Design a protein with these regions (language model features):
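NAD(P)-binding Rossmann-fold cofactor-contacting core
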Residues: 30-51
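Adenosine-phosphate binding glycine-rich loop
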Residues: 1-9, 103-147
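Short glycine/serine/threonine-rich phosphate/pyrophosphate-binding segments
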Residues: 20-24, 45-48, 102-103
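Accessory recognition modules or surfaces
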Residues: 1-12, 44-53, 70-72
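Residues in the short beta-alpha loop(s) of Rossmann-like NAD(P)-binding domains
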Residues: 18, 40-42, 100
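Rossmann-like adenosine-cofactor binding region
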Residues: 48-123
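Glycine-rich adenosine-cofactor-binding loop
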Residues: 8-29
C-alpha cells in the first residue's frame, strides 16, 4: 500500500541490527530487496555481512542513503537528522519502528515531502509473538502494487 512497486530489487536501509533489525533484514532479503543494514559495533557489522546483507557503519550513513527507496529505523535514538534525510530521494519511505524518541523527526521528514510511517514500540521482549505478527503486517503491506 505504501509503494507502487514490490520490494523485489528495492534498495532498503535498516538502521540497527538488534532483534528487530536482524529479523526485518532476513524478511526483506527473502522478498528480494537489496538490504543494507547499519550498526555501531564491529561485531554487528561482521554479522550483517555474514548474514548476506551490506553492512554500513551507522555513523557513516550518507552513501547508503543515496538512492535508498525505503528506510526502516529500529534505533530508539536520533540517527536520521535533517542533513541525512536530505540524502533520500523525494519519493522515499521512512518507517519508524523504534520506541521514543525514534530515529528522526516526523515533522521534518514530512515537511521535506518524504513519506513517513510511525509504527513504534514493538514489544519484542514482553510479547515477541505479537511483535512478530505486527511486524509481519507492516512488511506484508509494503510489497503490494498500487491499484
Amino acid at each position: 500500500r505504501e509503494q507502487n512497486t514490490t520490494l523485489f530489487d528495492t534498495r532498503c536501509v535498516v538502521l540497527g541490527y538488534g532483534r528487530c533489525g536482524s529479523a526485518l533484514c532476513r524478511r526483506l532479503a527473502a522478498l528480494g530487496a537489496k538490504v543494507t543494514a547499519s550498526a555501531r559495533r564491529r561485531e554487528q557489522l561482521a554479522r550483517i555481512y555474514a548474514d548476506g546483507h551490506t553492512p554500513c557503519d551507522i555513523n557513516k550513513l550518507s552513501p547508503a542513503l543515496d538512492g535508498c527507496e525505503v528506510v526502516f529505523n529500529t534505533v530508539p535514538a536520533p540517527v536520521l537528522p535533517e542533513e541525512l534525510l536530505r540524502r533520500l530521494p523525494p519519493e522515499a519511505l521512512v518507517v519508524e519502528l523504534a520506541s521514543a524518541p525514534g530515529g528522526c523527526d516526523a515533522a521534518v521528514a514530512e515537511a521535506m515531502g518524504l513519506r513517513y510511517r510511525n509504527a513504534p514500540g514493538l514489544p519484542g521482549k514482553a510479547a515477541p509473538r505479537t511483535a512478530g505478527e505486527y511486524l509481519g503486517q507492516v512488511i506484508r503491506g509494503l510489497p503490494h502494487w498500487e491499484e
